[in-house]
Amino acid sequence: MSSKKFVKYFILLSVIFLGFHIIMWEICTKYVLADVLKVGDLARLSYSNDMVDDSHKDYSIDLPKHHIRSSFYNYRDQVDLITVGDSFSNGRAKAKNRYYQDYIATYSNINVLNIETTYNGRNAPLETVVYMLNSGLLDEIKPKFILIQSVERFTIQRFGKASLNIELNATKQQLKEFFREHPYSLYIPENNIINTGNYRALLYKILYQYQNDAYFSRIIKEDLTKKMFSVANSKKILINKDSILNIKKANQKSIKILNENLNILAQLLEKKGIKLYFMPAVDKFNLYRKYISNDNLPESSFFEMLREQKKDYIFIDTKKILSKKIDNGDIDVYYADDSHWSHKASNEIFSKVLFK
């Protein structure tokens, strides 16, 4: 091949390459990757620009009382309630009034401390409370209540596999330093116009037409029987595939282990005059399941089985509370583009569940 032909082919391929990336970026990818803080995780991972919820552009907090984050706590101010959980407890929804703890503080008129990162293990809230109990840190803080939160789909693997170890030990100073030095943080990738996401975006646009998970996506896309979200594609729902795959983990045996672990912790805390609350955050799939057109999908019985257990703790039944809300026609209880609930859900739950 002559040098002139090589140059021509090189220029042509470069134009095609750049043109593809510019076009895909402008019509799709920039809406889900340009500013990941303003896009929910489900839309971002599925490249569903028609499901992006503009609510993420509003980060305002207009509630009269706010919670305290553990990375800023001085261990002098009064704390009535301590919350320990996952991304739901750390405002991962990235929108207006994103912290449910602020609704607790406002409606119950109490001071709330959130432990942002669990100690000595990822997503280990039960163990973190045991460490705080055995170290004497709870004696120092003197809370009246502790709330353990976990998203439904990961609750069994966190709490329902083995008996809780109540002999865990750490010093108060170790815990204080850890909580101060480990604030909850998000990994924010930087994306330019030329990026591999443009290829995935085109591929997903095609494959989602034939398969609800585009054959290899982590996100499932299904039709709804009625409008549930105020986005361009308001009768579609995005679901985390884990929500479906993990349904079978909730059985009578695992639910019993989960309940026993919570009862053990509740009994230990009761000796200190502390009430334990447990709040599993209902999966988006479970909450909206009866409004999904596809009848071949499984159904979760996690909440139904847990309701039957004898409890020494207070169970916050988020499925029962939020199901009534969506059955009444409320939309955007969860964000269309995200796996987290909206401020509407937090308001609904904690206007009813009061800490007194």
List the predicted regions and their residue ranges.
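Extracellular glycan-modifying ectodomains
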Residues: M1-K356
